[in-house]
Amino acid sequence: MNRKILIAALAGAGVAIAGAVLYFTDTIERQPGALAVFTPKAAKTVPFWPARVTTLAGDGIPGALDGPAASSRFDDPFGVALDSKGHIYIADAGDTNRIRTIAPDGTVATFAGSSEGFKDGVGTAAAFNTPSSIAFDHEGNLYVADTGNHAIRKIAKDGTVTTLAGDGSRGDNDGVGRAARFNGPVGLAVDDTGVVWVADTYNDRIRRIGRDGTVTTVAGGRRPGNADGIGAAAGFDTPSAIAVATDGTLYVADTGNNAIRRIAGDGTVTTVAMPQEGERRPVLRRPAGLALTRDGYLYIAASSGGRILQLTPEGEYRALQDADVPPDADGFGPDGTVQLYGPRGIAVERDGGLVVADANAHRLHRLSRPRAGEAPPARPQPVAVRREAPMPWPVGPQDTVHEVVGVMGEVRGSYNGDSRDHFHAGLDVRADVGARVLAVFPSKVSDPYANWGFDSLSEGLSLGPLSYIHMRVGRDSRGKPLDPRFQLLLVEEGKARGRPERVRVPRGTRFAVGDPLGTINAMAHVHLDYYQGGAVVNPLTLPFVGFTDTVAPRINSIALFDSSGTRLRPPQGTRKQPVLDKRLRVPRALGEVNIVVDAYDQVDGNLARRRLGLYKLGYQLLRADGTVVPGYERPLITQVYDRLPRNPDAVKAVYAPSSGITVYGSKSTRFAYAADSRLRDGEAKTGSWNVAALAPGEYILRIHAADFAGQVALEGRDLALVIE
């Protein structure tokens, strides 16, 4: 995945400090410009090194639990910083709102903060609201971008928390200390003179806080934009991270523009990295974390897609390769790169390794070069937390059953003619156009860029463990904001003046159960994606009030195809010479064949025309008398739609080409499953059925097609065969 950046390079960056990469020490004389960066001079950065991923802390369940690393819990780990003694500092937001530490022995503890609020004090007497980026100065003070409080906080080495700038209210004023205002600042870095640089995220500006507390604006205009230029002529869109080199050069993760920007000492903004035009699935998507090495390499946390990118001083970027996960030969599995779930803050260790906060997985990871003879660590799996209490529905009335019109794992196409473009990743609940979409969990926005697709059919919002899609986010059917939590941007010029052109839902925004999130758009349903530990899991595991399923799946047909894709058909007779034995004859000489099952499901309350996907699929081989063939005592379950592969192309491994739905141009909705291909535990693999291994004779191929409720299709499940 080479990416040549033709716009600019990072040459001459010099020794660099990022918002989460600064080490400090008591042994170095503190003078202006005397920075203690403890990367050994001999340890030069290796371009595009293979990374081994190990888990440092967090058991994958959201919470706030101190103690041993393996049993500790984090809610929304974001910013990361390291000190000279090997301690890792983490800004843990969500419901935790604390600054936490991991000691060299792995013990997790709370350094500052307790309940959500805005309060100075010592240690746990202080209060934060959604802390994000953190960074040390060379005196050992830790600075915090306190996003929900629209403020920058300072923590002394003894744990005393004070407010450096901002008064807790949203605004864009320059000024001194509390006279200045910010709008949800997420990114922060400190240079070697003690100046604090802030990515003022929802003001779309870069701000500077001098040593005397004076706040000034360095770059960015009044509104989101995408433009190079000087000062206010430059445009950013939701900048969420910032890093600074010792020569004063700034690097900005311009999240909404999928770009990395550079700000020179004179305020000139240039773009140094962004996806190439037309790139199908770019790796540089929604950058949310940055870290600079002393020799000018920039690490980027791409929060959408989960990659960790390295940008060289020459301007080339790639995703770091995973030392223990090679690329899948079929092209349907891993691509060989490190892929976390929701990487945010990054810090560079002394040996050049990385510490990364994975907010969506509720874990902290280390990326390091593998050592000779060292066995790869076990990869932690997403933790499933079963919910027992009845769940409200995402549309009103929330305590009344609504029709489910789509389930996870169904095939979906694209509008450019591909009938198998991606998996349907969630649950669809029918509702009238204009109906309000309502929150089903008490949740807080984590992602700095939480909503997308303004005025498109796919418009949606990521909130807590769910994404709500196919709605006008934060607006009623007339485009009016539902409440002040939604920041509506209006057109300022021309005939469309006064009309909404965008809505923002900032990081740290809270919603209670039943709060309106938007209104149903022309898709006439709300789509729910459900995440646990970062992985997309089946929303049918949520116990929605009154939901029942007593309808068994149905099988339309079972077909076999040879390796060339030609369907095997039973013998065809004529009127004069009818064929009495219409069993399908399968020559052993074919070797490998493919089993394709056309099947669908329904649930209680579905219209007769509704077609839903299966939850579980497999097959069993019987003799003609109904006795089982050895090795097939139980059905061989090949596909379980509890989790989905992260590679969207995996849909082509488990669905035959004849699959498709009418929304994307197919004549009818058809789920034609490649039943011998595997999908288990979120991993897909193409497969086949080896008929050459069978003895000649008469058999019955029995399909096991089940729904989430455990009901199995009975009619049409058997295909009589003669292996010859």
Where are these regions (language model features)?
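Gly/Pro-rich loop segments of beta-rich domains
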Residues: 42-76, 107-132, 160-184, 214-240, ...
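Residue-level detector of Asp-centered blade-edge/turn motifs that repeat once per structural unit
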Residues: 82-85, 136-139, 190-193, 244-247, ...
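Conserved beta-propeller blade signature
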Residues: 87-89, 141-143, 195-197, 249-251, ...
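Short loop/turn segments immediately following the C-termini of beta-strands
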Residues: 93-94, 147-148, 201, 255, ...
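A short loop-to-beta-strand structural motif that recurs across blades of beta-propeller domains
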Residues: 97-100, 107, 150-154, 160, ...
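Blade-level signature of beta-propeller repeat domains, shared across WD40, Kelch, NHL, RCC1
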Residues: 342-378
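Surface-exposed, glycine-biased beta-strand/turn segments
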Residues: 373-467, 472-479, 505-516, 520-526, ...
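Long, low-complexity serine/threonine/glycine- and acidic-rich segments characteristic of extracellular
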Residues: 506, 512, 548, 566-568, ...
